Amino acid sequence: MSQDFVIEAFPRDDQGKGASRRLRREERKIPAIIYGGGKDATPVAIWHNELKKAIENEAFFSHILTVDIQGKKESVILKDLQRHPYKPILTHADFLRVDKDHEIHVNVPLHFINEDTAPAVKLQGGIVSHTMTEVEVICLPQNLPEFIEVDLNEVEMDQVVHLSDLKLPKGVKVAALQQGEDHDLPVASIHKPKGAKADDAEGEEGEEGGEE
């Protein structure tokens, strides 16, 4: 992990819907909660615009974050983020404390590379389909990857890349695979465009008819 994210936070005593509305309207902050780690949950308030800017960076969602509560720092991950149903406004955030000695479950983005240069695409006209854009991993906080790279260069036409095909950093496991082989889900594939198979079939039939 190459980036550090620090979120300024403030103790929050007033709770409830009315207090949360005042917080958002008058102070430009949103309510948040920090929980887990064998400690009591801590209600805090954080600057709305600061958080909104931070989440523009994809890495924010797969990093260990630092929440600074007036000098007291907590290491956390973002577990949930609530948004207004139709306005570009954040309404609440949940942060989970992390311990360097305990594994965490985090959704990490998948970065697909060599999509355009893969022979099945460039030479055979295949189309890449993404079944997943992120994957839940299990690891110690210090091993948390910013993203997982999926190289499509060697993927052949009609081949499917599964979770078990992912190349994971040391100390990182795919959560779904811990539940057995039945959970080895597809991640991406390369296939012919719609209509191409039908055209191929018609071409084969025409060749057979010509031979007669």
UniProtKB/Swiss-Prot annotation:
GO terms for biological process: translation. GO terms for cellular component: cytosolic large ribosomal subunit. SUPFAM superfamilies: Ribosomal protein L25-like (SSF50715). Keywords: Ribonucleoprotein, Ribosomal protein, RNA-binding, rRNA-binding. It comes from the Bacteria. One of its GO terms (molecular function) is structural constituent of ribosome. Residues 201-212 have a biased composition (Acidic residues). InterPro entries: Rbsml_bL25/Gln-tRNA_synth_N, Ribosomal_bL25/Gln-tRNA_synth, Ribosomal_bL25_b-dom, Ribosomal_bL25_C, Ribosomal_bL25_long, Ribosomal_L25_dom, Ribosomal_uL5_bac-type. Residues 183-212 are annotated as: Disordered. Belongs to the bacterial ribosomal protein bL25 family. CTC subfamily. This is one of the proteins that binds to the 5S RNA in the ribosome where it forms part of the central protuberance. Part of the 50S ribosomal subunit; part of the 5S rRNA/L5/L18/L25 subcomplex. Contacts the 5S rRNA. Binds to the 5S rRNA independently of L5 and L18. This is Large ribosomal subunit protein bL25. The gene is rplY.
